[in-house]
Amino acid sequence: MPLAQLKEPWPLMELVPLDPENGQTSGEEAGLQPSKDEGVLKEISITHHVKAGSEKADPSHFELLKVLGQGSFGKVFLVRKVTRPDSGHLYAMKVLKKATLKVRDRVRTKMERDILADVNHPFVVKLHYAFQTEGKLYLILDFLRGGDLFTRLSKEVMFTEEDVKFYLAELALGLDHLHSLGIIYRDLKPENILLDEEGHIKLTDFGLSKEAIDHEKKAYSFCGTVEYMAPEVVNRQGHSHSADWWSYGVLMFEMLTGSLPFQGKDRKETMTLILKAKLGMPQFLSTEAQSLLRALFKRNPANRLGSGPDGAEEIKRHVFYSTIDWNKLYRREIKPPFKPAVAQPDDTFYFDTEFTSRTPKDSPGIPPSAGAHQLFRGFSFVATGLMEDDGKPRAPQAPLHSVVQQLHGKNLVFSDGYVVKETIGVGSYSECKRCVHKATNMEYAVKVIDKSKRDPSEEIEILLRYGQHPNIITLKDVYDDGKHVYLVTELMRGGELLDKILRQKFFSEREASFVLHTIGKTVEYLHSQGVVHRDLKPSNILYVDESGNPECLRICDFGFAKQLRAENGLLMTPCYTANFVAPEVLKRQGYDEGCDIWSLGILLYTMLAGYTPFANGPSDTPEEILTRIGSGKFTLSGGNWNTVSETAKDLVSKMLHVDPHQRLTAKQVLQHPWVTQKDKLPQSQLSHQDLQLVKGAMAATYSALNSSKPTPQLKPIESSILAQRRVRKLPSTTL
């Protein structure tokens, strides 16, 4: 089912009485009163032997790039390693001040280090280094560019139960692994579930985790986020790993409905609801989802699914997960439903701007008490994976220049970082200039967009999400001064595709096939992701260098591009699109995809014929050109057509079909014999008209098309209800 993010989730809900508990005291008697043990440390002491690497790390080995988050006793930075063996690699560095940590927090920090050093799992964040100075503790972790699941919920991507199932299944495997090590997570909430750049999850923030000595041992300390707490945590009667499965149910409920199952007006009321309230079960959820939620929301932990001797296997066997291939899931072979919009390696677009806009500064720590250093004695760790099998350090990665991407909307001055050079091109809403980065002297292009004429947010998001494709222009930097947005991209040194082709002394049909194959693959990738370019004229297809190699082509200028969205303006996962999108929305998407294919057909025709199909030159009127386009008639005889293969003519005809819904799809273009059997194509030279005449005719064609339709205005998505509901609860750190 599509998941309705409800304003008020309780109408039409079945109230489910949760099982009464034997021996559980009421909230007034237990969980809602301050515990006399609250100040007593009851954490279990953990010691681990960790195999050391070749050298211990220290703060000087890391270059601070950005602040990612900040809490009451520390910060999280984006850092770059500057020493071998992993120089140039990006990490998240968690810095905790010893002097501001209470004793129980100090033990939690050492616990987090010990747990992470012992855990190696595809869905748990990896610890690479841990060390201390006189006043601080340092944890060096994976830098996960996709942000957290909290962000996904608050931005309300339209997803289905199948999509939620993917995240919950990966989460179940991660929790199962922690439980197998005797670790109770205890702080399971969306903020602590991060996404990598592909969209897979990683559990993080183990400050509240507890390592149990055995399955009979229970923990008693009061910890975690109250809305996600299990009843036995609330009433402090002791809890085991089954408390995590209650929190897992809360997370599942929230992801499926957009609301928390137990939330009062304050902390005390919320705790009372957790201990006593009947659960409102939304009837739009599948029977399988409702069944799993009921099995997880058992107030008696002994009756809760996942608490038995089989542990997580009970969860995995539930009918809700009948479609999951757990082995494929563990191997990360199942494609995530959502790909975060991240591009460059030091990209922090998905972290809170309140933190990322701050100048990174690792402030000196206050001298700690004498006892603090003893507590953290031996607190250092180097991941063994940073060593080769023979004990020699790994070769360093290619050096990364020190351009640090700036957040869109950060109000930094573009000219502080770049010197602007000559104009490259001018459009209706923007102009493009060459620029030089002051710190590195590297050349880029900058597209300066007038915000009063066009909202660039869709273009930025598409470039961030898909710009890592080898044949899509790469976004390097974004600035916003209020009036203009500056998009810094790689510089296209090789010029336009048609310029290069028509200036060649020899250009053959076989070479044209290689060009179309490269561009077709890129368009097929975009269409498969629900993105249509809608302005694929040859002047927007350029070479990144002067080699003329088809693999060096880039599709540029996504100013008219669109991502497939629901009627409410939200993005949709592929599962949502396939099952719940209105026919007229899909028809419109098919029309837009057909327009992209038509543009590729125009390009193919021009490469083969040496002239454009519907315009004779720049002096043709828009009316004349549109009449020819509307008739769907173009010549495939005379000139080059006398030597061009029949398969080429067949492909051109099917790409330029007058009915957009009868044109080939990008996938069908790639499967056409003219593309798949390049070695059979002629290598004879193709002639062409004068370059300026061809380019003038091409410009006239697209000018006529653009004059015949109004330009749609893209509007930014308003803040969601869920985001507003949870904004006051934003965590101080996402790591």
Swiss-Prot record:
Gene name per UniProt: RPS6KA1
GO molecular function: ATP binding; magnesium ion binding; protein serine kinase activity; protein serine/threonine kinase activity; protein serine/threonine/tyrosine kinase activity; ribosomal protein S6 kinase activity
Pfam families xref list: Pkinase, Pkinase_C
Positions annotated as active site in the UniProt record: D187 (proton acceptor), D535 (proton acceptor)
Domain AGC-kinase C-terminal, chain residue ranges per copy: 322-391
Enzyme class: transferase
Compartment(s): Nucleus; Cytoplasm
Modified positions (Phosphothreonine) in chain numbering: T359, T573
Modified residues (Phosphoserine): S54, S221, S307, S363, S369, S380, S732
Protein name listed in UniProt: Ribosomal protein S6 kinase alpha-1
Occurrences of domain Protein kinase (ranges): 62-321, 418-675
Disulfide bonds: none
One cellular-component annotation, GO: cytoplasm
Entry annotated with the keyword Nucleus: yes
Free-text activity regulation comment from the record: Upon extracellular signal or mitogen stimulation, phosphorylated at Thr-573 in the C-terminal kinase domain (CTKD) by MAPK1/ERK2 and MAPK3/ERK1. The activated CTKD then autophosphorylates Ser-380, allowing binding of PDPK1, which in turn phosphorylates Ser-221 in the N-terminal kinase domain (NTDK) leading to the full activation of the protein and subsequent phosphorylation of the substrates by the NTKD.
Enzyme Commission numbers on file: 2.7.11.1
Any coiled-coil regions, as ranges: none
Subunit structure: Forms a complex with either MAPK1/ERK2 or MAPK3/ERK1 in quiescent cells. Transiently dissociates following mitogenic stimulation. Interacts with ETV1/ER81 and FGFR1. (Microbial infection) Interacts with Kaposi's sarcoma-associated herpesvirus/HHV-8 protein ORF45; this interaction allows RPS6KA1 activation.
Cofactors demanded by this protein: Mg(2+)
Post-translational modification comment from the UniProt entry: Activated by phosphorylation at Ser-221 by PDPK1. Autophosphorylated on Ser-380, as part of the activation process. May be phosphorylated at Thr-359 and Ser-363 by MAPK1/ERK2 and MAPK3/ERK1. N-terminal myristoylation results in an activated kinase in the absence of added growth factors.
Catalyzed reactions per annotation: L-seryl-[protein] + ATP = O-phospho-L-seryl-[protein] + ADP + H(+); L-threonyl-[protein] + ATP = O-phospho-L-threonyl-[protein] + ADP + H(+)
Primary role: Serine/threonine-protein kinase that acts downstream of ERK (MAPK1/ERK2 and MAPK3/ERK1) signaling and mediates mitogenic and stress-induced activation of the transcription factors CREB1, ETV1/ER81 and NR4A1/NUR77, regulates translation through RPS6 and EIF4B phosphorylation, and mediates cellular proliferation, survival, and differentiation by modulating mTOR signaling and repressing pro-apoptotic function of BAD and DAPK1. In fibroblast, is required for EGF-stimulated phosphorylation of CREB1, which results in the subsequent transcriptional activation of several immediate-early genes.
InterPro entries in UniProt: AGC-kinase_C (IPR000961), Kinase-like_dom_sf (IPR011009), Pkinase_C (IPR017892), Prot_kinase_dom (IPR000719), Protein_kinase_ATP_BS (IPR017441), Ribosomal_S6_kinase_II (IPR016239), RSK_N (IPR041906), Ser/Thr_kinase_AS (IPR008271)
UniProtKB keywords: ATP-binding, Cell cycle, Cytoplasm, Host-virus interaction, Kinase, Magnesium, Metal-binding, Nucleotide-binding, Nucleus, Phosphoprotein, Repeat, Serine/threonine-protein kinase, Stress response, Transferase
Broad class of the protein's primary localization: nucleus
Example GO biological process: signal transduction
